[in-house]
Amino acid sequence: MARDYPLDRYRNFGIMAHIDAGKTTCSERILFYTGKSHNIGEVHDGAATMDWMEQEQERGITITSAATTTFWERTEDGTTADSPKHRLNIIDTPGHVDFTIEVERSLAVLDGAVCVLDANAGVEPQTETVWRQADRYKVPRMVFVNKMDKIGADFFNCVRMIEDRTGARAVPVGIPIGAETELEGLIDLVTMEEWLWQGEDLGASWVKAPIRDSLKDMAEEWRGKMIEAAVEEDDDAMMEYLEGNEPDVPTLRALLRKGTLALHFVPVLGGSAFKNKGVQPLLNAVIDYLPSPLDVVDYMGFKPGDEEETRNIARRADDDMAFAGLAFKIMNDPFVGSLTFTRIYSGTMNKGDTILNATKGKKERVGRMMMMHSNNREEIDEAFAGDIIALAGLKDTTTGDTLCAQNDPVVLETMTFPDPVIEIAVEPKTKNDQEKMSQGLARLAAEDPSFRVETDLESGQTIMKGMGELHLDILVDRLKREFKVEANIGAPQVAYRETISKEAEVTYTHKKQSGGSGQFAEVKMILTPTEPGEGYSFESRIVGGSVPKEYIPGVEKGIKSVMDSGPLAGFPVIDFKVALIDGKFHDVDSSVLAFEIAARMGMREGMKKAGAKLLEPIMKVEVITPEEYTGGIIGDLTSRRGQVSGQEPRGNAIAIDCFVPLANMFGYINTLRSMSSGRAQFTMQFDHYDPVPQNISDEIQAKFA
C-alpha cells in the first residue's frame, strides 16, 4: 500500500509550556479547526479531548503526553480547505514540573515544537526547563503567546523575556491587534494584512483586511526587524535587501523557515486559544516554519552490544531503508491492554510483523497497529517512516527501547531519566489486595521511568519513589481507579544520600575457622571523595598477584553492597571512588565470597574513617507573589533553611528565587496559600545535593538507626 501523504507534508511536533499557559486549550482548538473533534472541549469543564485520564480532567492539568494525528491545509481566504494536504502528529505534553520526564520522552521523538506562553506571565520556570530540554535535543521551535485576552497581557514583554530568559532570538511574524478585552485578531507581518475574527462560529472563519492607519507604523517597524533576521540566511537576499528590494512572500517564508530549522531564531505570534483567535495562523506557521521528517539530520545509532556505542549506523525518513523506530511511551488502555507509542524513523512496518527490540535483544510480534486520536484509536495495517503510532501486543518493550528490523539491528537512542527525590511507603488496606497492588505498581513503573518501586529489605514495606508530591499523589490515585486497590500511604520521606568527605586508607582482614576449610581474605583500599555528580568508580591497582584476578569481582561486589545501604542511616552512597591497592589470600581458605565480605566490612570501616556524611536534595524554588506578601514569604522560606538567590518583577507580581532543602518543603503549598490569600504560586524542581547540618544529621541517624 502506498502512503497517502508524502513525507514533506508531515509535521511531527509537540506543544510544550509552563502549567496553565493554555497548552491543552491550544491543542483542543487545533483539533476543532482541523475537524478532528466536532465540539470544543474546555479544560475548566473537564472535557478536553487531549486530557483523557480522569485525574487530568479533575485537576485541569495534563499528566501524560497524548499523541494525536490530524490534518490541515494552510489557507489564505478565511475558510478551512476541503482537502487537507498536511498530516500533523501532535503531542500535548504536561507543564507541571513533576512530569518533566514526559516532556523529555516526547521531545526525543519530535521534529519541532510550539512553545505556548501566558501573555501575562511570559517565560516561567517550567518554560525555561522545557526550553533547555528542547535545546538538548536540538528541536526547532516557534512561540505562541497565548491568553492575549487576559488582564495584563503584554505581547512585546513576552518577546523581550524570550530573549532574556532563553538566549534565543525572537522574531515576531504575527502581532496581536489589541489586548485584554480589546483583542480583535492579528497582523500577519509576512503578507501585511489584518486577520480578524468576528463571527459566531467559534472562530472557524475569519476575514482579512488592509492594516489600519493607526497600526501601520508599528507593523512596518516589526516587519523590518523580521526581514532583517530572514535575509541573514542568504547572501543574495541580503544584497538585494541592502539595495532596497524586499523579498517577495514565498521567498520570505522560505528564509524564515531556513532560519527556524537552523535554530538561528524563533518565530513568534500571538492570540487567544480560549477566545478562538489566532489558532489558524499558528497552524499555517507550523506548516511554513517547522520541519518535516525530511528536514531532520540522519538519526545515528550504534550496533547492539557495542560497548563503545560508536554511532556509525544512519537512519533517515525513507520507506526503502530498514525499519527502525523508538518506543517513547507505554500506556495502559482499558480496552486494548498495553499500548507502546512508537516513532518510526525509517522503513515501514506491517501488522503481524516480527521485529527486534535491539535494546533488550528480544523479538516482538506486532499484534495490532493504531493511529491515535487522544484516546480514540483507528486500526491500521501498515505504517511508514515519519509516523507516530501505537502498537499493541509487545511483551518486553519499555520506554526508550529501539525497535528495528531483525536482519539490520541498530540502537538509536539511550534516554536519560532523573533519580527520584521523594518516597512514600504504601500498603494495601486489605491483605487480598497485595498481589493486585504489586501488579498495578509494576504496570505504572513500566509506563513511567521516573517512578520506581522498591521493597525495604528490613521492614518488608513497599516504597514508591517519584519526582514530587503531586507525582506520587497521582500514582496512588491511579492505583485506586485503574487497579481498584485501596492503599494506605505513609508520610513522604526525603531520598537522602551518603558520601565521604576526605580520603582514607583501610585494611580489613576477614577470618573464619569452623572445622574443615575456613574463610580468609584481606583487602587494603583507598577511599576518595569525587566531585558532586561524578558517581562511583572502582579500580584495582594490584600488582604481583597479592589478590588473584578471580577474587577482584568479589571485592567490587562487596563495595557495591555498601553503596545501596550506607553506614550512617542506610541511604545510598554516592560520589566516591575506591582503589584496591593490596591484599592477602590463602590457597585453601580464600574464595570470592570471603573477599566480598572483607570488602564490605572494610568499606563500612573506611567510610567512617573518611568522614561519612549525609546529603539532602536541595530544590530550586520559585515563588510568584503579589508584592505585598513578599516580606512574609521570604521570612518563611528563610525559616525553612532556604537561601534566597534573587527577586525580580514579573508582570505585576514579584518572582522570588530560592534554594530550599526538600525536607522543609512538604505541604508548603498550604502555607503559601494561607500567607497570600491564595494569590501566590510556586514551582520547585531538584537542583543538587548538599551536606545535612550536623544537628539534623544526628536526628536522622537516630531515627533510622
Curated annotation (Swiss-Prot):
Cellular localization per UniProt: Cytoplasm
Record's keyword annotation contains Chloroplast: no
Keywords: Cytoplasm, Elongation factor, GTP-binding, Nucleotide-binding, Protein biosynthesis
GO biological process: ribosome disassembly
SUPFAM superfamilies with a match to the protein in the record: EF-G C-terminal domain-like, P-loop containing nucleoside triphosphate hydrolases, Ribosomal protein S5 domain 2-like, Translation proteins
Domain named tr-type G: residues: 8-294
Matching InterPro entries: EF-G-like_DII, EFG_II, EFG_III, EFG_III/V, EFG_IV, EFG_V, EFG_V-like, G_TR_CS
Residues the record lists as binding GTP: 17-24, 92-96, 146-149
GO cellular component: cytoplasm
Family label: Belongs to the TRAFAC class translation factor GTPase superfamily. Classic translation factor GTPase family. EF-G/EF-2 subfamily.
Protein name as catalogued: Elongation factor G
Organism lineage string: Bacteria, Pseudomonadati, Pseudomonadota, Alphaproteobacteria, Rhodobacterales
